[in-house]
Every structure is written in C-alpha cells, then in structure tokens.
Amino acid sequence: VSKNRLLTTCAYCLNGNITYALEGSVFIAGAAIQWLRDGLQLFGSAPESEALALSVKDNGGVYMVPAFTGLGAPYWEPEARGLICGLGRETEKAHIARAALEAQAYQTLDLIGAMCDDSGIAIDTIRIDGGLSRNDFMCSFLSDILNRDVEVPKVNEATAWGAAVLAAIGIGVFEDFEDAKTRWQRQKLFQSSMTVSERDKLCQGWKEAILKVRS
C-alpha cells in the first residue's frame, strides 16, 4: 500500500499468482494537446505541437497545469482546475504549446518521485508508449526533467502488448517472462543533457504553478 498517495493495483495474475503494482493516475495528458487543437484552435493537428514547441528556445516562463478535471496522483484534488500562468506580451502560441507538452514531464516527475519513495527502488530508465511517445520533443524533455533515460518501444501500445504476452505465456508460445523480455525491442532512446541548475529552475516553476492551482 502506497504511503505517497499512489494507487495499488493488480498488474497481472499468472498461474494463480497475483503481482501488484503501484499506479499513478494522471487525468489529463494527451487530452491537453487535443484541447489546444480543438478548443483553442492553436494548431491544426497534434504533431504540429512538436514543431511549435521547437520553434521557441524555452517556455518563456509559461506553465500549464492541465487540471481540467481535477488533479490526480499524488495530489488527489478533484476540485482543482486548469491553469496557464506566466503569460506576458511576448508570449506566443508556441510557448503555450510547449508548456502543455512540458506539463506531461512534470506530472511524470511527481509520480516517479512518489514511486521511488514507496518502493525504495532507484529508477534509472523508464519506458513510455502511447500517442505522446511519438513526440520527440516531449520524450527528450521528459528525459531532461527526470534525469533518466527514456526508451520508446517499437510496439507503441504497451497495454495491448502486455495482454498479448500474458496470453502467449498461457498457451506456451513464450516460456515465461524472461523469454518474453527478449522479444521487446527499443525504437528510440532519449538521454538527459540538461544542467542541474536549469532543471531545478524549471521544476521550481512547476511547483509554484501547482501551488496556485491548489490554493
């Protein structure tokens, strides 16, 4: 059971043996990009968010907390609502798009910190999948903020892959998990190149934005 406000969930059951996992629920991730596209019409397609983010040198002091339906783990504040702060006359739509992508890294940082505290395990590499993992800017920024390697698999839908692996083990196609692990293939690797001072400054800005949402 988590002491840092994460969920305890059943990861899988194999041969009657249940393996549990820690789960961190983030309510809004890729949906923040969809909102910028459809709600504010800042760009025409989700992939354009990456080009916009890369068109500016930094976030310009802009932060987005995408708490459109409340804050999930590790805060659990359902009444919280979204925030875009740090806007100035110099702010462009590119800064807002970048802030939305950067928010995914900060939310992940909050969860990874809680998981490391709960488990006592040092996490040096994380693997990500889904739509946002196709965004190289987000993956690179995630690696920078976490100060960890980020791997993107060739099979981009890990949930479906995991279900297929369990089925394959169950019918004998794979001998066991060790056999299944040999079938996993990495498509991309992202490694941090951000300085400690820059990381600390950015993370402090996120913490201040979270405080605004929670106040």
Predicted segments, located by residue:
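Active-site core segments that coordinate phosphate-bearing ligands/cofactors
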Residues: V1-S215
